[in-house]
């Protein structure tokens, strides 16, 4: 899980979703998981 000031899709399978007001990126590739800090 990467914590970043700005989250972006890295590959076509990445999805940006909002959970409890926190922007997250979920993907098949675990390296692409991100959360907005």
From Swiss-Prot:
Q: What is this protein called?
A: Large ribosomal subunit protein bL36
Its GO biological process annotations read: translation
Disulfide bond residue pairs? none
Q: What InterPro entries does the entry give?
A: Ribosomal_bL36 (IPR000473), Ribosomal_bL36_sp (IPR035977)
Q: State the family named in the UniProt similarity comment for this chain.
A: Belongs to the bacterial ribosomal protein bL36 family.
Taken from the record, one Pfam family name reads Ribosomal_L36
One annotated GO molecular function:
structural constituent of ribosome
Give the record's keywords alphabetically. Answer: Ribonucleoprotein, Ribosomal protein
Q: Which HAMAP family match?
A: Ribosomal_bL36
Coiled-coil annotation: which residues?
Answer: none
């Amino acid at each position: 899980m990467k914590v970043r000031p700005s989250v972006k899709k890295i590959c076509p399978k990445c999805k940006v979703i909002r959970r409890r007001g926190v922007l997250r990126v979920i993907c098949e590739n675990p390296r692409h998981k991100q959360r907005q800090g």
